[in-house]
């Protein structure tokens, strides 16, 4: 009897550890930084939406921070970039991400939600912006950064468009994702051309 209880206990412990490992893998695979590390993967098709990303407050914070980062990085590129294609891309990003933020604010208002946009970049994005400003080959660093940032933004938008909890904000995510996909495609093309 004791032996059966011991075996059952070991089995439960083993299953619990296996389940913990699976949660860690799923959660880890859903982070934008790790998704950006696999540029040719299609994470939206294979990654389960973390429960907090289906909630409007988390999505709004991430989407707004992404837009804020894109605008600030583009302003930096407008002054530091040497390649005309990189400068043109930066100009387009200021316009597009300013519009995206305005559209997000409208979606929030239309939804009746009381959600506030962040007023400052999160530390990780502020650090990326600071590092970008110090890059020796700015054009290449900016375009590498843009590919990563747009992939991360696209992943968040696609997941919220699929699993989001507020229909009007979900519609914003669905409408914005194709625009971000276009930016990602442009960024990859320019990145590949920049030496």
Protein language model regions, located:
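His/Met- and acidic-residue-enriched segments that coordinate or traffic transition-metal cofactors
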Residues: 2-10, 14-195
């Amino acid at each position: 009897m004791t032996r059966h209880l011991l075996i059952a206990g070991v089995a439960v412990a083993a299953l619990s550890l296996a389940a913990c490992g699976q949660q860690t893998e799923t959660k880890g695979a859903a982070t934008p930084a790790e998704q950006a590390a696999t540029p040719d993967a299609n994470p939206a098709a294979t990654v389960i939406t973390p429960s907090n990303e289906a909630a409007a407050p988390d999505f709004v914070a991430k989407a707004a921070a992404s837009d804020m980062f894109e605008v600030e990085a583009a302003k930096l590129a407008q002054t530091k970039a040497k390649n005309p294609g990189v400068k043109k891309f930066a100009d387009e990003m200021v316009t597009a991400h300013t519009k995206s933020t305005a559209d997000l604010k409208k979606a929030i208002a239309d939804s009746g939600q009381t959600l506030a946009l962040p007023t400052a970049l999160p530390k990780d994005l502020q650090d990326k912006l600071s590092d970008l400003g110090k890059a020796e080959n700015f054009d290449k660093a900016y375009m590498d950064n843009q590919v990563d940032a747009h992939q991360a933004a696209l992943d968040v938008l696609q997941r919220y468009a699929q699993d989001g909890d507020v229909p009007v904000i979900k519609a914003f995510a669905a409408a914005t994702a194709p625009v971000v996909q276009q930016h990602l495609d442009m960024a990859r093309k320019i990145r590949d051309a920049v030496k």
